[in-house]
Amino acid sequence: MTNLKFGVALPYVSAREVAELCTLAEETGWDGCFVGDAIWCEDPLIGLAAAAMTTQRIRLGTMIIPMPLRKPWKVASESLALDRLSEGRLILGIGAGAVWMGWQCFPDEVTDTKARAEMLDESIDILTRLYRREQFDYDGKHFHLKLTQMDLQYFPPKPVQQPRIPLWTPGL
């Protein structure tokens, strides 16, 4: 016997439509509802926050937040808030990002594949430590962070899901 689960991937739609479609997916028996992240679309975490308020059971996930375009500490704060709001139903899909998805419009963004992969690795390390609310210094190749105990008092609480929010990353 397997524990196979089924999720639905939503098209790029508004936050209100994400909430409506996730509610419909839950009502029709789906196990998960996933929202993409593209440069020109609404932020998936906003849509999933709306969905967290209209659903009770279905898992809510991103596919796939390109970490080279985000600061890991901001993603940590946002995902911790969404994990609490959804009562532990968040799956955080993150990746290095697909350069063909509009990055050419932003000449300051990192397009080198190796550098983007390094940024993803560093982001995973930082996210994991922030989810544990550790005091730490991080001096990576791409990200630098000095987190004191005083800083931690303002950072969101640990995630509902332990030991951390599930992090999914694609492989191509």
State each model region's role.
Residues 70-71:
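Aromatic/His-enriched, Gly/Pro-containing loop or helix-boundary segments
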Residues 21, 33-34, 63-64, 99-100, ...:
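N-terminal start-of-chain detector that recognizes signal peptides
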Residues 1-60, 158-165:
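N-terminal beta1-alpha1-beta2 module of alpha/beta enzyme domains
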Residues 2-4, 74-172:
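Internal, glycine-rich beta/alpha segment that forms the wall or movable "lid"
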Residues 9-13, 38, 65-67, 95-99, ...:
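Active-site beta-loop-alpha junctions enriched in small/polar residues
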Residues 31-36, 57-61, 85-89, 116-120:
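Glycine-rich loops and low-complexity Gly/Arg-rich segments
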